Swiss-Prot record:
The gene is yfjD. Its main location: membrane. This is Uncharacterized lipoprotein YfjD. A lipid is attached at C30 (S-diacylglycerol cysteine). A lipid is attached at C30 (N-palmitoyl cysteine). It is a lipid-anchor.
Length: 185
């Protein structure tokens, strides 16, 4: 690995397709259910009308929050500049390794979107929280590998203990062994 190399952590096309099917596909199915109800083509029209309407709105909301994943912005989730003076950055935000206090990929309470999607949450030493959206199109092991290989060696001791404390010894040794045998980055 060269000093100051840029590593791109990219999304998985399979997960992008599932997000599209789950939001747009189910939205169309619910719209069809609503249509069946309002044209009285089913004897359950009293259930089909409100259920179709509500679930169509729900799926439309899901499609809207997943929409950036279907654009070129969803190709690369974040980039890592390696080395001692490295940083995690996207087109909008940048955090140096020395400023990271805690890094994790989890659901959050900062918005309604956090109920449905995991984001990369970086807490800095000056108590700011930086959120990098993932739209659930990056698998957790890929994120773990990026942190373990390129970020963790350059973090301060508190950040290292926060990262390692998220996992049991068995979990961590299992995924470290997997990264050695089958690297994805």
């Amino acid at each position: 690995m060269k000093n100051q190399e840029i590593i791109e952590v990219k999304s998985k096309m399979f997960l992008r397709i599932w997000a599209f099917v789950g939001s747009a596909g189910m939205g169309l199915a619910c719209l069809w259910l609503f249509y069946m109800g309002i044209t009285f083509q089913t004897k359950y029209y009293l259930l089909a009308i409100p259920a179709g309407f509500l679930f169509t709105l729900f799926c439309l909301y899901l499609f809207i929050i997943f929409f950036p994943a279907f654009t070129p912005r969803g190709n690369t989730i974040f980039r890592i500049k390696t080395g001692k003076n490295g940083e995690v950055f996207t087109d909008k935000v940048s955090v140096t390794f020395t400023d990271i206090k805690k890094i994790e990929m989890s659901r959050h309470k900062f918005s309604l979107k956090g109920i449905f999607q995991e984001d990369i949450l970086i807490q800095t030493v000056d108590q700011k929280t930086i959120r990098i959206p993932t739209w659930n199109i990056i698998p957790n092991p890929l994120f773990f590998e990026a942190v373990e290989r390129y970020i963790l060696p350059h973090l301060n001791e508190e950040a290292k203990s926060n990262w390692i404390g998220q996992f049991t010894d068995i979990q961590r040794s299992a995924y470290l062994k997997e990264f050695e045998n089958h690297p994805k980055l």
